[in-house]
Every structure is written in C-alpha cells, then in structure tokens.
C-alpha cells in the first residue's frame, strides 16, 4: 500500500474531467504553469486515463474540502517531494491526512503552533490510490525541502504512522505519568515517617483508653439481664489465656473475705516479681474509669484470704494461682479499704450477729438422722452458757425429733444455726426429743424455767407452742385448739372426738374423716405427737382430764 502511494506521488494520474470541483479547479489552475497534467482526480464518475496504471473508479472523500488548515496534521509528515511538486495551493484549500485511516479521531489535538507557522507556505495535494480502499488521501508537504529519494519518502510516511500511534496513546501516557507522580508524592522521608508513627501510636493508645472507659460506663448503665447478655457474647470471643485470667480474678473476688496489706506486699508474699505487678497495674490503671474501687478491694483482700487458707491447711489456691502465673495487682492505687459486706464469707465464727439470717427467711429442707452432738461448743462458761443453751434448745422443741444429745455439747453460736435447721423440719416429734430437755436440767435450771423460756422463745412459731397445745382449757375445747393451729375449718370434722382420742389418730384416719390437704394432716400429726409426749411424761395438768367425753 505504501509502495503504491509512493508510485502515485511520482506518477500522478491525469484526469480530463474537472466537473466543477473547486479544489480540483484550484489545483488545475496552479498546475498549468508548470505541468501539462492535472494531479487531482475528479469527484465525479470519470475514469482515469493513465497509460501505466489501470486503477478502478476512484472518488474523492466527501469531507476533504471541509477540513480547515487549523485541524490538519501538518507535522505528521515533515518533508516534500522536491521538484516534482512545484505547483502551490492556497492554504484555505489545503487538506490533511484523514485520521480515520490512521486510527485517530478527527478531534485529536495536534501541534497547532506548527500548523499556524506553516499555514502560509505553498501546499500541494497528491492523490493516493490503492487496491484495498476507495478513499482519497491528501498529503501536505512543505516546499522548502528538496530531497526526492524514495527512502526518505517511505520513512516520512512511516513516521507519520508512528506519530499517529503516539498521539492515540497520549491519554494513557498522561494517566501513567500522573499515577507515577502521585506515587512519588505519597512517599515521605524517614524522619516524617517516624514522627507520624509516634503520633499514630499515641493516638491509638488514647483512643483505646477512651473506648475502654466508654465501655465500662456503658456497662454500668445496663440492667443485670442486659449485662448477662453482653458477657455471654464477650466470653464467646475471648482467648483462652484471657478466660483463664478472668476465672482467676473471679475466684479471687468471691473467695476473698476481708482487707489485707497493700497490693505490693501481697505480690511479695505470692512470690511474684514486684516489677511485673507494677507494669500490670500501670496498664490497667489507665484503662480503669474509676480507679481504687473494686480492683483495690480485691487486691487488698487477697492477702487475708491466703492467710486464712494457710491456717486451715489448704494450699489449693496457691497451686492454682502459681499455675496461672498471673498477677493479682490490678490497680496501682490500692488502699486499705474495709469491706464488711464480705466478712461473712471468711468464717461463721467471726461474722457479726447482724449477719445471721432471720427466722422468717429460712431454707426449708428435711434433715434425717441429724445429731446435735456433731457441733462442738466454743463458749461454755457456767450458768450463763447453760441459760443460753436452754433458751436455744427450747426454741427448737417444736420440730426436730431426731436430735439426741446433751446440752453441754452445744455452743451458743452453733445452736442458733441448729435452730434454723430444726425449725424448718417437717418431721413429727417423738418422745426422744423430750429427753433432750430433761437432760439439760442441772443445779441452775428447773422445769419451770424451761417452760418459761420455751414460751418466750417460741413466739416465732406460736401455732406449735407445746404450752398452748397442752393447755387444759384448749384441750377440752377442740375448735379453739384447732384454731391455734389455724386449722379451724376442720372443727366440724374433728369436734366429736375428745383430745385423748384425737391425738392417736393416724394419717389414714384423718384422710378418711375428710382432711384432704397434705399440709394440714402433717401439721395435725405434729401437734398430736407433742401432746402425746407431754401426756406420757405427765406434764399435762390434771384439769384437762376432768371434762373428757
């Protein structure tokens, strides 16, 4: 194709028909002064009359005359064809290489300054024909250059193609240059990197502490159920080491009972290095929203708990703690804060009397084969101890029938715990329990004092008071006797029996008579047992036997 173009430039095809084409006429008029043949091919349907080339019908590009010199590419091919192209063409009629043939858009911006500089130079157009295209190509050449060898012409055409390819890739080059320049600007020097890293680390540390404080504040505003849900989700994502640390801290929290020396002394006694404890305390002190609160209490209480464990011969906590290898100094602002709310966890012998549970909040269960002799006395000092013991024993007269022991084996503190157990038992009392009261008598106590203490100590359970149950007036009036037991709705069922017959009824007899409630039957059987025991020991007044039916 390039060879054909080269041949056509040196051997133009004459055309006899101009058909009124302004471009062709202009070229023809200019060419008459120098040559006899017209190099411009007509836009019409005329055939070429060249004796050398027998080319098919060829027409000019319909938009060739519409291209202005400002949009032509005069810098694509910067050469002329020497003496062969002497005619000149006005700059307004000059055309350029069509960009579509070189893969370019007509709107591609070229070097307009060069075009303006060369716009006044004489121009000429040469038709180019090939077997593969039907378009006319117009080439612009500068007149000053006089070199006419074929190699320079081919090189100029190739240079034009290369230039067109380079223009088509201009956008990509601009993009790559901007990308590389952006990368270069994004690389600071080493000193700025170090400063930025230090500032970033400081900001991260501050943000972490702020997040922890906000989390603690948010957790404190949640309800117990919401906190449980949050902890369930947090525990599921924690590491094993963190879970072990949390378990150790919880064990210490609920196993600690009282305050201890400072956290540093506790760390020394545990065999942990003091430096590691201080590091952990400094780290946790920053993240703690309220320092010196529970962490300080738990850290202070750890020493007292370890001392109590060592005196009782238990080394379980030491082994568990040493295996963890963790520090208990969670706060650097530890202080000797007294926390009496946890004193009852230490030992029941040291807890205050106010910590004793009231009788109305007792745990109800049914003991079996419970012996009071299992408890050892701690304060048995003559008559005062016996008086306290008698009062406590009389408080438990109403419920437990399995305890057989001596009063001298019961301490004042332990008997109160015993009363909490025995008062809640729902087992019928037998005569074996009454032997306990008789064995408690000595030189300073009498039966009358026992009865008086019994009546005063049984105010919490007046319905089962033996004194009221064995009162002759109540025994001779069954409806009133049942009313003391709060079972007066069964008066019509049991009113026809005397108290001596009534106390020997069994569970089946009560069920047959219409006492269907299990609790009512048990309560009646318990009262029957107390009255039978008093009758067997002749503790009931003789007036109760006068009005027997």
Swiss-Prot record:
Residues 1-13 have a biased composition (Basic and acidic residues). This is RNA-binding protein VTS1. Residues 128-140, 189-206, 379-415, 435-469 have a biased composition (Low complexity). Residues 473-534 form the SAM domain. The keyword Cytoplasm applies. InterPro entries: SAM, SAM/pointed_sf, SMAUG/VTS1_RNA-bind, VTS1_SAM. Keywords: Cytoplasm, Nucleotide-binding, Protein transport, RNA-binding, Transport. It is found in: Cytoplasm, Cytosol; Cytoplasm, P-body. GO terms for biological process: nuclear-transcribed mRNA poly(A) tail shortening; protein transport.
């Amino acid at each position: 194709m390039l060879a054909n173009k080269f041949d056509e430039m040196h051997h133009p095809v004459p055309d006899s028909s101009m058909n009124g084409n302004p471009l062709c006429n202009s070229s023809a008029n200019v060419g008459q002064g120098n040559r006899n043949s017209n190099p411009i091919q007509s836009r019409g349907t005329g055939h070429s009359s060249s004796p050398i080339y027998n080319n098919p019908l060829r027409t000019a590009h319909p938009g060739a005359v519409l291209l202005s010199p400002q949009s032509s590419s005069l810098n694509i091919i910067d050469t002329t064809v020497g003496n062969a192209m002497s005619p000149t063409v006005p700059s307004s009629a000059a055309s350029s290489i069509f960009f579509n043939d070189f893969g370019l858009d007509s709107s591609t911006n070229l070097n307009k300054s060069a075009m303006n500089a060369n716009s006044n130079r004489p121009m000429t157009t040469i038709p180019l024909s090939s077997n593969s295209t039907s378009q006319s190509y117009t080439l612009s050449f500068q007149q000053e250059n006089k070199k006419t060898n074929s190699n320079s012409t081919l090189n100029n055409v190739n240079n034009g193609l290369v230039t067109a390819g380079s223009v088509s890739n201009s956008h990509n080059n601009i993009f790559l240059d901007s990308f590389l320049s952006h990368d270069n600007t994004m690389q600071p020097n080493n000193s700025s990197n170090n400063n930025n890293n230090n500032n970033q680390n400081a900001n991260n540390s501050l943000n972490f502490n702020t997040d922890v404080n906000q989390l603690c504040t948010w957790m404190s505003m949640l309800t117990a159920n919401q906190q449980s849900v949050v902890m369930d989700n947090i525990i599921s994502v924690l590491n094993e080491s963190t879970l072990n640390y949390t378990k150790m801290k919880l064990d210490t929290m609920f196993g600690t009972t009282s305050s201890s020396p400072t956290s540093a002394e506790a760390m020394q006694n545990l065999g942990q290095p003091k430096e590691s404890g201080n590091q952990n305390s400094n780290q946790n002190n920053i993240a703690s929203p309220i320092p010196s609160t529970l962490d300080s209490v738990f850290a202070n209480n750890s020493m007292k708990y370890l001392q109590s464990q060592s005196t009782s011969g238990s080394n379980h906590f030491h082994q568990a703690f040493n295996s963890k290898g963790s520090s208990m100094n969670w706060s650097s602002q530890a202080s000797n804060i007294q926390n009496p709310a946890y004193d009852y966890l230490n030992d029941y012998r040291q807890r205050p009397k106010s910590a004793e549970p009231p009788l109305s909040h007792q745990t109800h269960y049914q003991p079996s084969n419970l012996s009071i002799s299992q408890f050892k006395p701690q304060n048995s000092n003559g008559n005062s101890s016996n008086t306290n013991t008698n009062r406590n024993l009389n408080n438990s007269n109403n419920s437990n029938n399995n305890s057989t022991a001596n009063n001298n084996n019961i301490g004042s503190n332990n008997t109160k715990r015993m009363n909490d157990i025995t008062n809640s038992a729902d087992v019928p009392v037998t005569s074996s329990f009454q032997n306990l009261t008789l064995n408690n008598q000595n030189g300073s106590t009498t039966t009358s004092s026992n009865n008086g203490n019994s009546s005063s100590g049984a105010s919490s359970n007046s319905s089962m008071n033996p004194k009221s149950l064995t009162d002759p007036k109540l025994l001779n009036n069954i409806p009133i006797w049942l009313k003391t037991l709060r079972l007066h709705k069964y008066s019509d069922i049991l009113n026809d029996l005397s108290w001596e017959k009534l106390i020997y009824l069994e569970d089946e007899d009560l069920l047959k008579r219409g006492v269907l409630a299990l609790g009512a039957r048990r309560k009646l059987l318990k009262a029957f047992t107390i009255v039978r025991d008093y009758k067997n020991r002749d503790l009931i007044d003789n007036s109760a036997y006068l009005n027997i039916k």
